[in-house]
Amino acid sequence: MCIRDSKKVAGNEFERKNGAYTLHLLAPAKVGLPYGTVPRLLLAWLTTEAVRTQNRELFLGDSLSHFMHELDMVPTGGRWGSITRLKDQTARLFASTVSATYADKRSHTEAGFRLADRSTLWWDAKAPEQAGLWESSVKLSETFFNEVIAHPIPVDMRAIRSLKKSPLALDIYAWMTYRASYATKPSEIPWQALAMQFGSDYAQVRDFKAAFLDALKKVLIVYPEARVSHGDFGLTLAPSRPHVRKPTKALPGPG
């Protein structure tokens, strides 16, 4: 989640670099790129469900209201309401194509994939409580599903819901609990590197640092087990207990 921009991006391409790693997100011009908290909530739910069910085919419930409840969103109508935002960001996310490149002096590796092969949404915005004739569903792409199963991010959806008003806090939480799941010794990450990794739009690193530390306070309320400290140079993460234990067995399901 920490690689999604928290603000609307002009155009239909988004690129972010972090050292030798480059992420490129492409969306159809008429659909646009996903942004804000809603795609983060969707990604957290999708990856959690994929690991829980071990299946590429995920069912979103028989009504719009039911699924919004899963994301801790209250259905509201109108042009700027939550229903409009959810439908818009869902379309943007499922239509996007991701490519990741790692290139240094010795190697060049590239991988690309869609998040979803198919999505079918039987949602009536005028009657969010009403069940559709069929249950809404999404079929994750095989590449994305396999990546999720092989490298699950151990997030607690209750924490995700409580942080939903802050895109940066959501990104920090997912990043910290993922790092905690494999860290074996303390590591210090420079503020400059963090600003690049989290897609900062701040003009100065010190401004990003202030925003990051403010969001970190919110994260530590829901994830107090995280062992983290900060100084002038950067942020230090020590091995911590993941917020959610990773599954002991992760085998792809049918489909």
Feature annotation, model-predicted:
Residues 4-255:
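Charged, alpha-helix-forming regions
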